[in-house]
Amino acid sequence: MGKAVVVLSSSEGVSGTVYFAQEGDGPTTVTGNVSGLKPGLHGFHVHALGDTTNGCMSTGPHYNPNGKEHGAPEDDVRHAGDLGNITVGDDGTATFTIIDSQIPLSGPNSIVGRAVVVHAEPDDLGRGGHELSKTTGNAGGRVACGIIGLQG
């Protein structure tokens, strides 16, 4: 079983830990807990670069090895890193589980060494009609991020 982890942090008081587990070539299970967010939906994506030298801004675009448009996790046309939204409760905390087949932990399209970014606003899943809908889901600013690392 492959395992990875990312510790999310920000200058805005958002923090959390996200775990990834993959059995063989099967889907990857993502489990996490993030706190310090405003209640509601927040875009949650794997970004292309594991570079936080300029905070979350240097993590690049959504991870997109297949050159597709932005979409929902269940869509055929989507970035590999499009994991949709996490739901934050009134206490500012999100606890979630996502199962996804486009974010392997090994092989040529591995997400290890890339970044996870939590956004300020909901991801419209490419359906919002905004000029950014088909690239970012119009999910707003980047409020927390971290680099995905292998876990023993």
From Swiss-Prot:
SUPFAM superfamilies: Cu,Zn superoxide dismutase-like
Binding site for Cu cation: H45, H47, H62, H119
Classification via InterPro entries: SOD-like_Cu/Zn_dom_sf, SOD_Cu/Zn_/chaperone, SOD_Cu/Zn_BS, SOD_Cu_Zn_dom
Main localization category: cytoplasm
Subcellular localization: Cytoplasm
Keywords, sorted A to Z: Antioxidant, Copper, Cytoplasm, Disulfide bond, Metal-binding, Oxidoreductase, Zinc
Oxidoreductase recorded as keyword: yes
Lineage: superkingdom: Eukaryota
Family, similarity comment: Belongs to the Cu-Zn superoxide dismutase family.
Protein name: Superoxide dismutase [Cu-Zn]
Organism: Spinacia oleracea (Spinach)
